[in-house]
Every structure is written in structure tokens, then in C-alpha cells.
A protein has these predicted regions:
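Short-chain dehydrogenase/reductase
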Residues: 64-68, 103-111, 142-146, 173
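N-terminal Rossmann/SDR dinucleotide-binding element
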Residues: 1-57
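Conserved beta-loop-beta element that borders a ligand/cofactor-binding pocket
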Residues: 115-140, 154, 160-169
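Conserved Rossmann-fold NAD(P)-dependent oxidoreductase catalytic core, especially the SDR/UDP-sugar
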Residues: 72-114, 121-124, 128-131
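Glycine-rich "substrate-gating" loop/helix at the edge of Rossmann-like oxidoreductase active sites
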Residues: 103, 134-144, 166-174, 197-200
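A conserved pocket-lining segment of Rossmann-fold NAD(P)-dependent short-chain dehydrogenase/reductase
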Residues: 151-174, 186, 191-198
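NAD(P)H-binding glycine-rich loop region in Rossmannoid oxidoreductase-like domains
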Residues: 33-73, 77-81, 94-101
């Protein structure tokens, strides 16, 4: 979320005047934040970006805890505050559970989060946006954590071995600045929607 927070702060601080929005506050909630802070943020928010998630757990059960249970807590806080602001969920192409992603525990947890968001939107008349991210690369991506490109570049630059599991696999990539542009467009109410084989993204 650092790239999004930086972009929003640049708009707030008038360093970026190219956008057709005003940003007064940027609330950041993470593992160190309190449930009281979450309630306060959910009372005042005009738009919620849920970028929380677990992608490198110690136990498989942590996928559901981080990718579903927090989403449920977040949506419940919005519901309790009667806040019907738009909500955006960062999901993954693995949620399709097709091809090389079939049976992915990570994908299952992301799909469960998507279904929760869509149900919340239908029940509460809220605009819900779900973005299924492919492999991201760019500023602040971390090797051996959240970016295959960062890992590849890090290993090459440091003379470390690289691993290619299947040379025939086409890797889907998204540059972080392009993603941030779309997220700001969504904040402005200019989101892009697409549908892929029984899936709306």
C-alpha cells in the first residue's frame, strides 16, 4: 500500500494537481492499529481501499485469517457506522482457481473475500470494486516476498541462482504505477470494468 498512500498524500499535499479530487485525510490501518482506530476510520472514510492480505503464511490457515476474516471485520465496521462509501478489494488472479491456480489455498481465500465483498455490496447498496492483480513489479516491491520480478532482478544482480518452474508459463505482469493510476481513477469514479469467462473483474 505504500505506493497508493504516497500517491494520495501527494494529492492531499497539492504536489500532484493533475487529479480531479480533493484528499483531506489518508487513514492507514495495519496490524499495529487498534480496533478502535478501525471503527473511527470506517466512520469517516469516503472510500476504502482494502489492500490487506497474507501471501507468505507460516500456516495455510493464515490465508483465510488474513484474506477473508479481516475483510469481514472491515465490512462489519463500515456496516456498524452506516457508512456506504465505495469499497475496493485487492484480490489476485489466483482467485480464478483455474489452470495453474486450481486448488490454490491462497486463491480460495481471495475468492472467499471477493464473494464477501460482493454480498456486502448487494445487501447494502454499496459500490464494490474487486481488482484481481497479477504479478506486480515496481517501486517498493520486495524480493522473495511479493514480486517475482523483484526476486528475479535481485538474484541476477547479486549472482544468486534463479528458478524457473515451467518455461512455458506466461507470467502476467502489472507495473505498480499503472495500478495506482487505476486506483486513483476508481477514487474519482472513473473505474474500468472487464469480464473474463464467468468472472467480473
Amino acid at each position: 500500500g505504500r505506493n497508493l498512500v504516497s500517491a494520495l498524500e501527494n494529492i492531499r499535499d497539492k504536489k500532484d494537481t493533475t487529479r480531479n479530487i480533493q484528499v483531506e485525510c489518508v487513514y492507514q490501518y495495519d496490524r499495529k492499529s487498534t480496533s478502535g482506530e478501525l471503527m473511527d476510520y470506517c466512520k469517516d472514510a469516503d472510500f476504502v481501499f482494502n489492500l490487506a492480505g497474507v501471501n507468505r503464511p507460516k500456516k495455510q490457515s493464515e490465508f483465510m485469517e488474513g484474506n477473508y476474516e479481516f475483510a469481514d471485520t472491515l465490512l462489519d465496521a463500515l456496516r456498524k457506522n452506516n457508512n456506504r462509501c465505495p469499497v475496493m478489494l485487492a484480490s489476485s488472479i489466483q482467485a480464478a482457481l483455474m489452470g495453474r491456480f486450481a486448488g490454490s489455498d491462497y486463491g480460495k481465500s481471495k475468492l472467499a473475500g471477493e464473494e464477501l465483498f460482493f454480498k456486502y455490496g448487494r445487501s447494502n447498496g454499496v459500490n464494490v470494486l474487486v481488482y484481481r492483480f497479477p504479478n506486480l513489479f515496481g517501486k517498493w516491491c520486495r524480493p522473495n516476498y511479493n514480486s517475482a520480478v523483484a526476486t528475479f532482478c535481485h538474484n541476477i544482480a547479486n549472482g544468486l541462482p534463479i528458478q524457473v518452474n515451467d518455461r512455458n508459463t506466461e507470467l502476467e505482469l502489472l507495473y505498480i504505477d499503472d495500478l495506482i493510476d487505476e486506483m486513483i481513477a476508481a477514487l474519482e469514479g472513473r473505474e474500468h470494468r472487464c469480464e473474463f469467462e464467468d468472472t467480473t473483474a
